[in-house]
């Protein structure tokens, strides 16, 4: 059964494995989530489930969302995300999804919004080398050559240049689940995941480990 859950990034810490080695982990508060809606191939053209996470007061929702939750008989949730799962038909509306669907040793893909860095140059944004710092150099951290002169007499689209960095949807693949704490709804995965503290994350089965 394919699995997926929503969670919040708590922060990073470290644990020790059986050999006594330090393992850096990210602590995620995963679930409990509720299936708010089911989408089927016959009705919607594809199979998926809509999952809600974190309770919220009904007064903080607009009318369309209030009606959406009332229609399916589910308590209002702050976050709604759609998960395309191969066996979405096995889930039922109102079903609770908890963190214990995962177990230590499994591999997961974690999706989040990366930290926004603002407007950055090519050295920080793209990892380019700086120019010479002495001997009459005319530039140090500039882009350098941006293309030919007479022909084509323009800069091609896609050229790596300064601009806004971060704040984009990023997925980190094939992270190992180190520990699962069902009592506190905590999931510990090896390594780092995108996003600030308390940012929303989507945790799914890894596509590479299948």
UniProtKB/Swiss-Prot annotation:
GO terms for molecular function: rRNA binding; structural constituent of ribosome. InterPro entries: Ribosomal_uL3, Ribosomal_uL3_bac/org-type, Transl_B-barrel_sf. This is Large ribosomal subunit protein uL3. Belongs to the universal ribosomal protein uL3 family. SUPFAM superfamilies: Translation proteins. One of the primary rRNA binding proteins, it binds directly near the 3'-end of the 23S rRNA, where it nucleates assembly of the 50S subunit. GO terms for cellular component: cytosolic large ribosomal subunit. Gene3D superfamilies: 3.30.160.810, Translation factors. The lineage of its organism: Bacteria, Bacillati, Bacillota, Bacillota incertae sedis, Caldicellulosiruptorales. It holds the Pfam family Ribosomal_L3. The keyword Ribosomal protein applies. Keywords: Ribonucleoprotein, Ribosomal protein, RNA-binding, rRNA-binding. GO terms for biological process: translation.
